[in-house]
């Protein structure tokens, strides 16, 4: 979301280990206020039954919304004035490969770091904000 909406004004959230299957928190709720006024709310639950799993990102604006899956179907649904249209595209087979190659090249000393330290620190700050308040 940082790529789409820019700098963050505030981030907060809660996390908990509901399932108890492992030591890490398995549910996270995160909220972000971006500097441009965009509001974000995310929910990640890693212990739902397979038939209840949902991979959905919705971006809602004053004229409609855009819905898409992050890891699922390669399509975007645009809803405007109550009417929906779908844009389908070919699923990228190796979507992470270019970044992995750059990271390997960086560790081999062949290129500069593909991600700045400040970007990494910002992502870690958001993760900490999402998970610092415990729900249980």
Where are the predicted features?
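Short acidic, glycine-rich loop/turn motifs
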Residues: 32-36, 78-83
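Short amphipathic beta-strand/extended segments with alternating polar/hydrophobic composition
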Residues: 42-44, 67-70, 79, 83-93
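Active-site loop of classical SDR/Rossmann-like NAD(P)-dependent oxidoreductases
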Residues: 89-101, 115
């Amino acid at each position: 979301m940082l790529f789409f909406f820019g700098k963050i004004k505030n981030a907060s959230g809660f996390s908990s280990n509901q399932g108890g299957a492992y030591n890490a928190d398995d549910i996270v709720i995160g909220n972000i206020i971006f500097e441009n006024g965009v509001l974000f709310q995310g929910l990640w639950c890693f212990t739902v039954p397979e038939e209840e799993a949902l991979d959905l990102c919705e971006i809602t604006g004053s004229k409609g919304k855009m819905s898409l899956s992050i890891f699922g179907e390669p399509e975007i649904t645009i809803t405007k004035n109550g009417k929906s249209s779908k844009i389908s595209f070919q699923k990228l087979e190796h979507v992470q490969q270019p970044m992995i190659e750059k990271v390997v090249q960086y560790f081999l000393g062949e290129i500069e770091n593909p991600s700045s330290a400040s970007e990494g620190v910002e992502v870690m700050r958001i993760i900490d904000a999402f998970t610092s308040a415990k729900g249980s």
